[in-house]
Amino acid sequence: MELHILEHRLQVASVAKESIPLFTYGLIKLAFLSSKTRCKFFSLTETPEDYTIIVDEEGFLELPSSEHLSVADATWLALNVVSGGGSFSSSQPIGVTKIAKSVIAPLADQNISVFMLSTYQTDFILVRERDLPFVTHTLSSEFTILRVVNGETVAAENLGITNGFVKPKLVQRPVIHPLSSPSNRFCVTSLDPDTLPAVATLLMDVMFYSNGVKDPMATGDDCGHIRFFSFSLIEGYISLVMDVQTQQRFPSNLLFTSASGELWKMVRIGGQPLGFDECGIVAQISEPLAAADIPAYYISTFKFDHALVPEENINGVISALKVSQAEKH
């Protein structure tokens, strides 16, 4: 297996809902007019609390500097596990549970914080640039580590870090944060970038203006329904995560879906904003899922984390995570 260190240097930022009008010009340019920018990595996720933006340095320049933009204090690098060579677009998707044991747990054991972004195409593991020597040292026994430089994949240099390493103990990692599962059913999909102009107006409405149109058939007091929408445009590939009500607004022939038309339920992790320094949160969730062989997407945002699991598995997942939660007491 290969671990690719991509060349994007990323910023992770948050914008409050009420401040988003200050940023829509730049965000629309990044999402819909990418040929007019040098940005190659852009992701925007709306949650009930805020908008999380993950963007490379070139794309970050498109956003106005403002007190309303909270930026995480670090430059982040994206790692990508590739099975069978080739770029992330052509390789088989691995799924966050498949990398739980090989990537996520070892990094948690070394107290290296990660920020996850699963897309339709692949899973990106974001690590702080300053942690990279520790990351490569930790994972070098499991992976051939390659670095993308000017679009070419080359062997990553071994930075020879040895001090500061602890022999990982096989620790139990109980789930320590509150969990909730909204009532929404989600799909993870994509569309051909050539068809983006055909749905640009609709996408802009969904992203910035519609404020989450609820299913008119749903009961008016569906308090379990949350606002969640994620759009990523990374190296020319689009990924969309949206609930079924939002999906129904799109022409059905434009969205790619899995042949099974699988729907996903969400586990939301966190009662208070999680911050960026705590290690092991992704591992706490992904390890029990991996043990049960349940596929999952995982999307970290500025304040909370989100795991998506197949709809039919949600009750079992919640039970397994609650058992893990009980173990901390």
Curated annotation (Swiss-Prot):
This is Cytosolic arginine sensor for mTORC1 subunit 2. Residues 72-140, 262-322 form the ACT domain. It holds the Pfam family CASTOR1_ACT-like. It comes from Homo sapiens (Human). Functions as a negative regulator of the TORC1 signaling pathway through the GATOR complex. As part of homodimers or heterodimers with CASTOR1, directly binds and inhibits the GATOR subcomplex GATOR2 and thereby mTORC1. Does not directly bind arginine, but binding of arginine to CASTOR1 disrupts the interaction of CASTOR2-containing heterodimers with GATOR2 which can in turn activate mTORC1 and the TORC1 signaling pathway. The gene is CASTOR2. Its main location: cytoplasm. GO terms for molecular function: identical protein binding. The keyword Cytoplasm applies. InterPro entries: ACT-like_dom_sf, CASTOR1_ACT-like, CASTOR1_N, CASTOR_ACT_dom, CASTOR_fam, CASTOR_mTORC1. It is found in: Cytoplasm, Cytosol.
